[in-house]
Amino acid sequence: MKRALWFVCVLALSAMAAGPLRAQNNPFLGTWKLNLSKSKFDGMPAPKSLTRTVAAEGAGATYTFTGEDADGKAIEYSFTSNYDGKDSAVTGSGMPGGADTVAMTRVNSNLVRTILKKGGDAIGMSNTEVSKDGKVSTVKLGGVGPDGKKFNAVSVYDEQ
């Protein structure tokens, strides 16, 4: 009986330790600053500044974006995703294309694919990749804005 109880305790402790280990293996976590000189925006204005902060949250992560758009207005939006392809609500303002939900899927350890949606309809897609050394994150984004015009961007972020 004591041996069975000990075994159950070891299993429980192992399960609790697995969460932080999974988070440590997520190269997307951290604070990332947009490098405007290495980024390109087509069909949409480049922001004056943008910082992406990614924090572990359960099986996934919470993404928070803050900065200033081309007109000097504040950008501040966030969402939490488990990388399971399910819709996650976006709160705040400044999300590309006016998206109100995102559906994120982890393609591999360094690549996440995101579908941007507005009112349940897909309006864009992005692929976010972290370099092997973990110092650069590149977001390739394409979609259609609220005005019906196509937009594309390659945003390069440096890890802080």
Model-derived segments and spans:
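Hydrophobic small-molecule pocket/channel-lining residues, especially in calycin-type beta-barrels
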Residues: 21-160
